[in-house]
């Protein structure tokens, strides 16, 4: 009898590093501005960041304007973004897989096509845009609060923001960064309409109104 098990795609790591820091041997950890998961050993963090920096530097020899954007392996996908000069953000996700057991024999098939580079790149860009919306650019924060201040804000923001990213549910619609309408029956839609009209009538200084429920658009 055959049985199967599906493992969904997951966020494995997310980090921000500055290539201008930690240039001396033994100070490489200073490059890291933020790293998730935080419980990784320092050696592993430094090794992963160093590998990414080496990949970027190597690919710059072929295309200086657009160096390494994504790395594919059988089990992982890694995407790169340079939102500001010399500051890189890297996200690594697992490739979903299906395990089948038939007559005691176990086979695992990784579904590469399920993970799209463009979708992950959009998610990475959005993560930076959201930080910039609330705090300003990395450079501005660093100029105002210093490197440790930047690290603290990155930690505070991304430790919460990354919890909202469901990698397995990212799809082509994520690229357009749109918003879904909340389906309502006529009665509930009319109540929402009346509520918005009441608010706008009561507070005359309101010029535009957006009514959200969760992450869906009502009005």
Language model features: what each stretch is:
Residues 1-219:
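Intrinsically disordered, Ser/Thr-rich regulatory regions of eukaryotic membrane-trafficking proteins
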